[in-house]
Regions:
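Short loop/edge segments at beta-strand edges and connector loops
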Residues: 20, 55-56, 103-105, 111, ...
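A general structural signal for well-ordered alpha-helical segments in protein cores
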Residues: 4-7, 33-39, 56, 87, ...
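Short aromatic/hydrophobic contact patches that present stacked aromatics
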Residues: 23-25, 72-74, 190
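C-terminal lid/capping helical subdomain adjacent to the catalytic/cofactor pocket in oxidative enzymes
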Residues: 123-126, 288-337
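Active-site substrate-recognition segment that forms the wall
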Residues: 16-18, 152-301
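A short, glycine/Asx- and small/polar-enriched loop/turn
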Residues: 31-35, 62-70, 111-116, 123-124, ...
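Helical element adjacent to the flavin cofactor pocket in flavoenzyme catalytic cores
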Residues: 73-115, 122-124, 133-157, 320
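Dinucleotide-binding Rossmann-like beta1-alpha1 core, especially the glycine-rich loop
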Residues: 1-58, 62, 69, 217
Protein backbone atom coordinates (compact mmCIF):
# COMPACT_ATOMS: atom_id res chain seq x y z
CA UNK A 1 0.00 0.00 0.00
CA UNK A 2 2.79 2.42 0.85
CA UNK A 3 4.53 1.61 -2.42
CA UNK A 4 1.37 2.23 -4.45
CA UNK A 5 0.79 5.56 -2.71
CA UNK A 6 4.37 6.68 -3.31
CA UNK A 7 4.33 5.49 -6.92
CA UNK A 8 1.17 7.39 -7.87
CA UNK A 9 2.62 10.53 -6.31
CA UNK A 10 6.01 10.11 -7.97
CA UNK A 11 4.50 9.51 -11.42
CA UNK A 12 2.30 12.59 -11.14
CA UNK A 13 5.20 14.75 -9.93
CA UNK A 14 7.70 13.59 -12.56
CA UNK A 15 5.52 13.10 -15.62
CA UNK A 16 5.75 9.31 -15.72
CA UNK A 17 2.94 7.70 -17.70
CA UNK A 18 0.43 5.85 -15.57
CA UNK A 19 -3.30 5.15 -15.35
CA UNK A 20 -5.63 3.97 -12.60
CA UNK A 21 -7.44 1.10 -14.32
CA UNK A 22 -8.92 -0.88 -11.46
CA UNK A 23 -8.77 -4.65 -11.27
CA UNK A 24 -11.25 -7.52 -11.01
CA UNK A 25 -10.22 -10.82 -9.45
CA UNK A 26 -12.84 -13.19 -10.83
CA UNK A 27 -14.27 -16.39 -9.33
CA UNK A 28 -15.90 -19.18 -11.33
CA UNK A 29 -16.50 -21.72 -8.55
CA UNK A 30 -17.70 -21.63 -4.97
CA UNK A 31 -14.22 -22.60 -3.76
CA UNK A 32 -12.72 -19.65 -5.64
CA UNK A 33 -15.39 -17.36 -4.17
CA UNK A 34 -14.46 -18.52 -0.68
CA UNK A 35 -10.78 -17.83 -1.43
CA UNK A 36 -11.70 -14.30 -2.51
CA UNK A 37 -13.77 -13.83 0.64
CA UNK A 38 -10.66 -14.58 2.69
CA UNK A 39 -8.73 -12.01 0.65
CA UNK A 40 -11.55 -9.49 1.15
CA UNK A 41 -11.48 -9.94 4.91
CA UNK A 42 -7.72 -9.46 4.98
CA UNK A 43 -7.90 -6.36 2.76
CA UNK A 44 -10.81 -4.72 4.57
CA UNK A 45 -9.50 -5.54 8.03
CA UNK A 46 -5.80 -5.82 8.70
CA UNK A 47 -4.47 -4.19 5.53
CA UNK A 48 -6.98 -1.39 4.98
CA UNK A 49 -6.98 -1.95 1.20
CA UNK A 50 -10.11 -0.63 -0.55
CA UNK A 51 -12.00 -3.48 -2.26
CA UNK A 52 -15.63 -4.18 -3.12
CA UNK A 53 -17.68 -7.10 -4.38
CA UNK A 54 -18.95 -7.07 -7.97
CA UNK A 55 -21.78 -9.48 -8.67
CA UNK A 56 -22.09 -11.60 -11.81
CA UNK A 57 -24.91 -9.36 -13.02
CA UNK A 58 -22.79 -6.22 -12.77
CA UNK A 59 -19.94 -8.00 -14.54
CA UNK A 60 -22.27 -8.91 -17.43
CA UNK A 61 -23.78 -5.42 -17.57
CA UNK A 62 -20.29 -3.95 -18.05
CA UNK A 63 -20.53 -5.47 -21.54
CA UNK A 64 -16.87 -6.40 -21.88
CA UNK A 65 -17.32 -10.15 -22.17
CA UNK A 66 -15.77 -11.04 -18.81
CA UNK A 67 -17.08 -14.17 -17.11
CA UNK A 68 -17.33 -14.33 -13.31
CA UNK A 69 -19.89 -16.98 -12.35
CA UNK A 70 -19.36 -16.39 -8.62
CA UNK A 71 -18.65 -12.67 -8.83
CA UNK A 72 -15.47 -10.63 -8.65
CA UNK A 73 -13.47 -8.77 -6.04
CA UNK A 74 -12.66 -5.28 -7.33
CA UNK A 75 -9.56 -3.30 -6.41
CA UNK A 76 -10.48 0.20 -7.62
CA UNK A 77 -7.06 1.75 -6.91
CA UNK A 78 -4.99 -0.70 -8.98
CA UNK A 79 -3.21 0.88 -11.95
CA UNK A 80 -0.53 0.52 -14.58
CA UNK A 81 2.71 2.43 -15.11
CA UNK A 82 5.24 3.02 -17.87
CA UNK A 83 7.98 0.91 -16.29
CA UNK A 84 10.71 2.16 -18.63
CA UNK A 85 9.67 5.77 -18.08
CA UNK A 86 9.80 5.19 -14.33
CA UNK A 87 13.33 3.79 -14.54
CA UNK A 88 14.49 6.71 -16.69
CA UNK A 89 13.04 9.20 -14.19
CA UNK A 90 14.72 7.48 -11.26
CA UNK A 91 18.02 7.29 -13.14
CA UNK A 92 17.85 11.00 -13.88
CA UNK A 93 17.29 11.88 -10.23
CA UNK A 94 20.10 9.55 -9.18
CA UNK A 95 22.55 11.12 -11.63
CA UNK A 96 21.45 14.64 -10.69
CA UNK A 97 22.40 13.76 -7.11
CA UNK A 98 25.90 12.75 -8.23
CA UNK A 99 25.31 9.04 -8.81
CA UNK A 100 26.93 7.09 -11.64
CA UNK A 101 25.16 4.28 -13.52
CA UNK A 102 27.78 1.80 -14.75
CA UNK A 103 26.20 -0.66 -17.16
CA UNK A 104 27.94 -3.84 -18.34
CA UNK A 105 30.12 -3.74 -15.24
CA UNK A 106 29.69 -6.99 -13.32
CA UNK A 107 30.89 -7.19 -9.74
CA UNK A 108 33.43 -10.02 -9.44
CA UNK A 109 34.42 -9.84 -5.75
CA UNK A 110 33.31 -8.08 -2.57
CA UNK A 111 35.43 -7.69 0.56
CA UNK A 112 34.11 -6.28 3.85
CA UNK A 113 36.69 -4.03 5.49
CA UNK A 114 37.37 -3.98 9.21
CA UNK A 115 35.80 -6.07 11.92
CA UNK A 116 35.87 -9.77 12.55
CA UNK A 117 32.48 -10.49 13.96
CA UNK A 118 31.91 -13.92 12.48
CA UNK A 119 30.04 -12.92 9.35
CA UNK A 120 32.48 -14.60 7.01
CA UNK A 121 33.72 -12.98 3.83
CA UNK A 122 37.15 -11.93 2.75
CA UNK A 123 39.04 -10.34 5.66
CA UNK A 124 40.93 -11.68 8.65
CA UNK A 125 39.30 -11.85 12.06
CA UNK A 126 40.09 -9.05 14.46
CA UNK A 127 42.10 -9.81 17.57
CA UNK A 128 39.72 -7.68 19.65
CA UNK A 129 37.74 -9.50 22.31
CA UNK A 130 34.63 -7.67 21.07
CA UNK A 131 35.20 -7.40 17.33
CA UNK A 132 33.17 -4.95 15.29
CA UNK A 133 31.05 -6.32 12.45
CA UNK A 134 32.61 -7.00 9.09
CA UNK A 135 32.13 -3.99 6.85
CA UNK A 136 32.39 -1.57 9.75
CA UNK A 137 35.29 0.13 7.93
CA UNK A 138 33.53 0.01 4.56
CA UNK A 139 33.51 -2.27 1.57
CA UNK A 140 35.77 -3.00 -1.39
CA UNK A 141 34.25 -4.14 -4.67
CA UNK A 142 36.05 -5.46 -7.74
CA UNK A 143 34.20 -4.45 -10.91
CA UNK A 144 35.00 -5.73 -14.39
CA UNK A 145 34.46 -3.67 -17.54
CA UNK A 146 32.66 -6.09 -19.86
CA UNK A 147 33.97 -4.28 -22.95
CA UNK A 148 37.67 -4.22 -22.06
CA UNK A 149 37.96 -6.95 -19.46
CA UNK A 150 39.77 -4.56 -17.12
CA UNK A 151 39.00 -4.74 -13.40
CA UNK A 152 38.82 -1.71 -11.14
CA UNK A 153 38.28 -1.37 -7.41
CA UNK A 154 35.57 0.69 -5.74
CA UNK A 155 35.34 1.41 -2.03
CA UNK A 156 32.13 2.41 -0.30
CA UNK A 157 30.77 2.96 3.19
CA UNK A 158 27.65 0.92 2.41
CA UNK A 159 26.42 -1.53 -0.20
CA UNK A 160 22.87 -2.40 -1.21
CA UNK A 161 22.45 -5.72 -2.97
CA UNK A 162 19.61 -4.90 -5.36
CA UNK A 163 20.96 -7.07 -8.18
CA UNK A 164 17.63 -8.74 -8.96
CA UNK A 165 18.24 -12.00 -10.79
CA UNK A 166 21.91 -11.78 -9.78
CA UNK A 167 21.26 -10.97 -6.12
CA UNK A 168 22.09 -14.48 -4.89
CA UNK A 169 25.44 -14.37 -6.71
CA UNK A 170 26.29 -11.09 -4.98
CA UNK A 171 25.16 -12.45 -1.60
CA UNK A 172 27.31 -15.54 -2.06
CA UNK A 173 30.43 -13.44 -2.75
CA UNK A 174 30.23 -12.09 0.80
CA UNK A 175 29.00 -14.82 3.14
CA UNK A 176 30.74 -18.05 4.18
CA UNK A 177 29.66 -21.27 2.39
CA UNK A 178 27.14 -22.33 5.03
CA UNK A 179 25.18 -19.08 4.55
CA UNK A 180 25.00 -19.14 0.78
CA UNK A 181 21.66 -19.23 -0.99
CA UNK A 182 20.21 -19.68 -4.45
CA UNK A 183 17.31 -18.32 -6.42
CA UNK A 184 14.83 -20.34 -8.47
CA UNK A 185 13.76 -18.90 -11.80
CA UNK A 186 10.12 -18.80 -12.89
CA UNK A 187 9.80 -17.60 -16.46
CA UNK A 188 6.56 -15.87 -17.32
CA UNK A 189 5.46 -15.96 -20.96
CA UNK A 190 3.21 -13.17 -22.25
CA UNK A 191 0.94 -13.26 -25.30
CA UNK A 192 -0.28 -10.25 -27.28
CA UNK A 193 -3.80 -9.89 -28.66
CA UNK A 194 -4.51 -8.31 -32.05
CA UNK A 195 -8.31 -8.52 -32.39
CA UNK A 196 -10.52 -5.48 -31.70
CA UNK A 197 -12.93 -7.51 -29.54
CA UNK A 198 -13.41 -8.32 -26.77
CA UNK A 199 -12.10 -5.03 -25.43
CA UNK A 200 -11.63 -4.84 -21.66
CA UNK A 201 -10.94 -1.61 -19.76
CA UNK A 202 -9.50 -3.01 -16.52
CA UNK A 203 -7.08 -5.67 -15.37
CA UNK A 204 -8.59 -9.13 -14.95
CA UNK A 205 -7.03 -11.73 -12.66
CA UNK A 206 -8.28 -15.26 -12.08
CA UNK A 207 -8.85 -16.24 -8.46
CA UNK A 208 -5.53 -17.41 -7.01
CA UNK A 209 -4.89 -21.14 -6.88
CA UNK A 210 -2.92 -22.43 -3.87
CA UNK A 211 0.61 -23.47 -4.79
CA UNK A 212 0.38 -22.17 -8.37
CA UNK A 213 3.68 -20.25 -8.14
CA UNK A 214 2.11 -17.13 -9.61
CA UNK A 215 -1.10 -15.11 -9.94
CA UNK A 216 -2.41 -16.98 -12.96
CA UNK A 217 -2.47 -15.97 -16.61
CA UNK A 218 -4.21 -12.64 -16.27
CA UNK A 219 -5.29 -9.86 -18.60
CA UNK A 220 -3.14 -6.77 -18.45
CA UNK A 221 -3.17 -3.51 -20.38
CA UNK A 222 -0.60 -1.07 -21.63
CA UNK A 223 -1.08 2.69 -21.59
CA UNK A 224 -2.45 2.55 -25.14
CA UNK A 225 -5.21 0.17 -24.04
CA UNK A 226 -3.74 -2.87 -25.81
CA UNK A 227 -4.38 -6.18 -24.08
CA UNK A 228 -1.81 -8.81 -23.19
CA UNK A 229 -2.17 -12.06 -21.32
CA UNK A 230 0.33 -13.52 -18.89
CA UNK A 231 2.48 -14.40 -17.19
CA UNK A 232 2.27 -18.15 -16.85
CA UNK A 233 4.82 -20.08 -14.76
CA UNK A 234 7.58 -22.02 -16.51
CA UNK A 235 10.46 -23.11 -14.26
CA UNK A 236 13.82 -22.65 -15.99
CA UNK A 237 17.44 -23.17 -14.99
CA UNK A 238 18.91 -19.96 -16.38
CA UNK A 239 17.83 -16.37 -15.72
CA UNK A 240 18.86 -15.61 -19.30
CA UNK A 241 16.26 -17.98 -20.79
CA UNK A 242 14.01 -15.21 -22.10
CA UNK A 243 12.74 -16.81 -25.31
CA UNK A 244 8.94 -16.91 -25.33
CA UNK A 245 7.78 -20.52 -25.29
CA UNK A 246 5.06 -20.58 -27.94
CA UNK A 247 4.28 -24.19 -27.09
CA UNK A 248 2.67 -22.95 -23.89
CA UNK A 249 0.09 -20.82 -25.70
CA UNK A 250 -2.55 -23.58 -25.88
CA UNK A 251 -2.52 -23.92 -22.10
CA UNK A 252 -2.68 -20.13 -21.77
CA UNK A 253 -5.71 -19.97 -24.08
CA UNK A 254 -7.53 -22.54 -21.96
CA UNK A 255 -6.90 -20.45 -18.83
CA UNK A 256 -7.87 -17.17 -20.52
CA UNK A 257 -11.15 -18.56 -21.87
CA UNK A 258 -12.28 -19.40 -18.33
CA UNK A 259 -12.75 -15.68 -17.66
CA UNK A 260 -12.88 -14.24 -21.21
CA UNK A 261 -14.67 -16.87 -23.30
CA UNK A 262 -14.96 -14.62 -26.35
CA UNK A 263 -11.22 -14.30 -26.88
CA UNK A 264 -10.14 -15.24 -30.41
CA UNK A 265 -7.29 -17.71 -29.98
CA UNK A 266 -6.12 -17.13 -33.56
CA UNK A 267 -5.33 -13.50 -32.66
CA UNK A 268 -3.00 -14.39 -29.80
CA UNK A 269 0.74 -14.44 -30.45
CA UNK A 270 3.88 -14.94 -28.34
CA UNK A 271 5.02 -11.50 -27.17
CA UNK A 272 7.77 -11.41 -24.54
CA UNK A 273 8.93 -13.17 -21.38
CA UNK A 274 10.31 -12.17 -18.01
CA UNK A 275 11.96 -14.02 -15.14
CA UNK A 276 10.78 -13.93 -11.53
CA UNK A 277 13.44 -14.73 -8.89
CA UNK A 278 11.80 -17.09 -6.41
CA UNK A 279 13.23 -17.92 -3.00
CA UNK A 280 11.55 -21.34 -2.99
CA UNK A 281 11.91 -24.11 -5.60
CA UNK A 282 9.09 -25.11 -7.92
CA UNK A 283 8.24 -28.20 -5.91
CA UNK A 284 7.77 -26.24 -2.69
CA UNK A 285 5.62 -23.64 -4.40
CA UNK A 286 3.65 -26.33 -6.22
CA UNK A 287 2.66 -28.02 -2.97
CA UNK A 288 1.79 -24.74 -1.30
CA UNK A 289 4.65 -25.15 1.16
CA UNK A 290 7.96 -23.41 1.61
CA UNK A 291 6.75 -19.98 0.48
CA UNK A 292 9.10 -17.11 1.21
CA UNK A 293 8.30 -13.40 0.99
CA UNK A 294 10.77 -10.70 -0.09
CA UNK A 295 13.98 -10.58 1.95
CA UNK A 296 14.90 -6.98 2.90
CA UNK A 297 17.39 -7.00 5.76
CA UNK A 298 20.75 -6.21 7.25
CA UNK A 299 22.77 -9.43 7.43
CA UNK A 300 23.86 -10.63 10.86
CA UNK A 301 27.56 -10.05 11.51
CA UNK A 302 27.94 -7.29 8.92
CA UNK A 303 27.66 -3.51 8.94
CA UNK A 304 26.55 -1.27 6.11
CA UNK A 305 25.06 -4.01 3.93
CA UNK A 306 21.38 -4.30 3.04
CA UNK A 307 20.34 -7.44 1.18
CA UNK A 308 17.36 -7.57 -1.19
CA UNK A 309 16.57 -11.12 -2.29
CA UNK A 310 13.61 -12.57 -4.17
CA UNK A 311 12.18 -9.19 -5.16
CA UNK A 312 9.62 -10.23 -7.77
CA UNK A 313 6.06 -9.04 -8.38
CA UNK A 314 4.87 -6.69 -6.89
CA UNK A 315 8.43 -5.38 -6.58
CA UNK A 316 7.85 -2.58 -9.08
CA UNK A 317 4.82 -1.30 -7.18
CA UNK A 318 6.76 -1.65 -3.93
CA UNK A 319 10.01 -0.14 -5.22
CA UNK A 320 9.82 3.32 -3.65
CA UNK A 321 8.64 1.90 -0.32
CA UNK A 322 11.49 -0.63 -0.47
CA UNK A 323 13.83 2.33 -0.90
CA UNK A 324 12.40 3.89 2.26
CA UNK A 325 12.94 0.66 4.18
CA UNK A 326 16.54 0.37 2.96
CA UNK A 327 17.21 3.94 4.12
CA UNK A 328 15.66 3.18 7.50
CA UNK A 329 17.78 0.04 7.92
CA UNK A 330 21.00 1.87 7.06
CA UNK A 331 20.42 5.21 8.76
CA UNK A 332 17.56 4.73 11.21
CA UNK A 333 15.20 7.21 9.57
CA UNK A 334 13.72 8.15 6.21
CA UNK A 335 14.36 11.46 4.44
CA UNK A 336 11.04 13.19 3.68
CA UNK A 337 10.27 13.13 -0.05
Amino acid sequence: MRGKQLLYGFCAAHGVGHRRTGKWIVAQTRAQREALERIERLCSGELGVPVRWVGDGEVRRAGEGVRAEEGALESPTTGIVDAHGLMVALQGLFEDAGGVVALNSPVTAITPLGGGGGGGGGCDASSSSSPSPKGSAGWELAVRDAATGETSTITAETIINAAGLGAADVHNMIVPPERRTRLHYAKGNYFSYAAPLPRVSRLIYPAPEPGAGGLGTHLTLDLGGRMRFGPDVEWVESPEDLAVNGARMADAVAEIQKYLPGVDASCLAPDYAGIRPKLSPGGAVGTGKGFNDFIIRMEDGYAGWVNLLGIESPGLTSSLAIGEEVERLLYGSVTPS
